[in-house]
Amino acid sequence: MSGAGAPKLNIDASDLQVAIVVTSWHTNITDGLLAGAERALKAAGNETYEIWRVPGAFELPLAAQKAIEAGADVVVALGVVIQGDTPHFDYVCSSATEGLTRVQLDYGVPIGFGLLTVNTEQQALDRA
């Protein structure tokens, strides 16, 4: 998927309780993702969001669920998983994606999907 054609939205998020759940792996990349999410929220009028740090992508769904249970109106999930030499990449990416989808559907609360699943660190840097 390319960033070309991304929608230009005018959103008022000033009254929303927003939780950003972000992984702790590859902070050189996730810090950039987090900064971008913070800029977008501030542009939408929200400066009272909460940041929830988790170890890795596998923990994103549970953190999203807990954030919703704590009152979040919307969750933004951020992280990066970089392909290695084992199938671990596939398991983590699938589990995180399916888990976030399940939480979103079970709770009826939107979850912005900002989990980069890439082949190389450079791809992640280019997308962050």
Residue ranges and their predicted role:
Residues 8-53:
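Glycine-rich phosphate/diphosphate-binding loop of Rossmann-like nucleotide-binding domains
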Residues 31-33, 61-65, 86-90, 123-126:
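Short, well-ordered secondary-structure micro-motifs
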Residues 24-25, 54, 79-81, 115-121:
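Short, ordered loop/turn segments at secondary-structure junctions
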Residues 94-128:
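C-terminal binding/interaction regions
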Residues 43-70:
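Active-site rim loops that border cofactor/substrate pockets in soluble metabolic enzymes
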Residues 51, 73-78, 110-117:
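Short beta-strand segments at enzyme active-site cores
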Residues 1-5:
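Short gly/ser/thr-rich secondary-structure transition/capping motifs
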Residues 63-100, 104:
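Glycine-rich phosphate-binding loop
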